[in-house]
């Protein structure tokens, strides 16, 4: 976690999940993987296992301890909705966001179909919360446009797009 993020559009990052698997061309030059792999094998480092998927339940309560309101990028070093993260764990992460409602949370995923489906079911309680923003990554037409469709079909109150890395013209949508 960092509560002094160098990412210009957020104040803090919160990573209750670490690591990810590649699912599309937008993952090829992943900054998070490059960063994490530098520390593979360093005992005691948060990324001693590189970019291998790891749940970090000891990080769950972190936003509750931050008393000053922040814009929080959730899982800057992972994707909360990747297939190997259990629904129950995702719900636990979102429950913390519901509780620590003085922050604004930015959730960004390439697994838009799962996010949409969970927002209609197990995360329905959080879909309309104004302090949780639900977003998708868009890198090309093949993957990005369907993610936009999934986001539009979700009940999310606040939606956003991250159009990076933009690998081709995606046209008008």
Describe every region a protein language model picked out.
Residues 1-72, 79:
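N-terminal [4Fe-4S]-dependent radical SAM core
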Residues 55-173:
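Conserved AdoMet/S-adenosylmethionine-binding subsite of the radical SAM
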